C-alpha cells in the first residue's frame, strides 16, 4: 500500500528552540489549541524520516494519533522500542524516557492530546539522562499565542 500523505499546506510549522540546547533537530510542531482552564493542549509534531530527536521524558499524560507515516520510539540507547503505523492511537502515562522519530519512507506527523497542568510537560535529557532543559505549559502557551 502506498504511504498516506497528509496535506499540511495550512499548518504553520514551527521549530523548537530550548536554552541551552538550541534548536531541536528533526522536529517541527504546530500548536492547534490550548485550553487555558483545563491545561489541555493539542499539538501536531512532525518528526523527520530516519532521524531521532533529542532524548526526553514526558511529564504529563499524552494521547497520540499517527496522522502520516510511521511513528518510531527508541530506547535511550537508540534501540527501536516501538513502531506505530498511520492510524494508530496510543494513550501513555508520564515518565517514559525515549527518543522519537519518523519511519524509513517519510516524515511522520503525530497528533498529541496533552493532559497536563501548569508545570513541566517535557524534560530534555542528555545521554546520561540528566535534565538539561524543560518545556513547560507556559512555553507551549507562549508558542500558541505567537503563531
Model-derived regions: residue spans:
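Conserved catalytic motifs of the protein kinase core domain
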Residues: 40, 62, 107
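Glycine- and acidic-residue-biased ligand/ion/polar-headgroup-sensing regions
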Residues: 49, 58-77
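A short, N-terminal "cap"/entry segment at the start of jelly-roll beta-barrel domains
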Residues: 1-39, 126-147
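Ligand-binding loop in jelly-roll beta-barrel domains
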Residues: 85, 94-121
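Histidine-/acidic-rich catalytic cores in large beta-rich domains
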Residues: 9-14, 42, 65, 91
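Conserved short histidine dyad/triad with adjacent acidic residue
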Residues: 31-33, 38-57, 93-95
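Short acidic-glycine-tyrosine-enriched beta hairpin
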Residues: 36, 74-102
Amino acid at each position: 500500500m502506498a504511504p498516506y500523505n497528509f496535506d499540511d499546506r495550512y499548518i504553520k510549522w514551527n521549530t523548537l528552540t530550548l536554552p541551552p540546547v538550541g534548536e531541536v533537530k528533526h522536529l517541527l510542531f504546530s500548536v492547534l489549541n490550548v485550553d487555558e482552564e483545563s491545561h489541555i493542549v493539542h499539538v501536531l509534531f512532525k518528526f523527520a524520516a530516519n532521524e531521532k530527536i533529542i532524548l526526553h521524558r514526558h511529564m504529563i499524560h499524552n494521547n497520540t494519533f499517527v496522522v502520516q507515516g510511521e511513528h518510531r520510539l527508541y530506547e535511550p540507547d537508540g534501540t527501536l522500542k516501538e513502531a506505530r503505523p498511520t492510524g494508530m492511537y496510543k494513550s501513555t502515562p508520564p515518565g517514559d524516557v525515549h527518543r522519537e522519530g519518523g519511519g524509513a519512507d517519510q516524515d511522520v506527523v503525530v497528533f498529541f492530546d496533552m493532559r497536563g497542568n501548569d508545570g513541566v510537560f517535557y524534560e530534555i535529557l542528555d545521554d546520561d539522562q540528566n535534565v538539561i532543559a524543560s518545556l513547560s505549559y507556559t512555553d507551549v502557551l507562549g508558542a500558541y499565542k505567537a503563531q
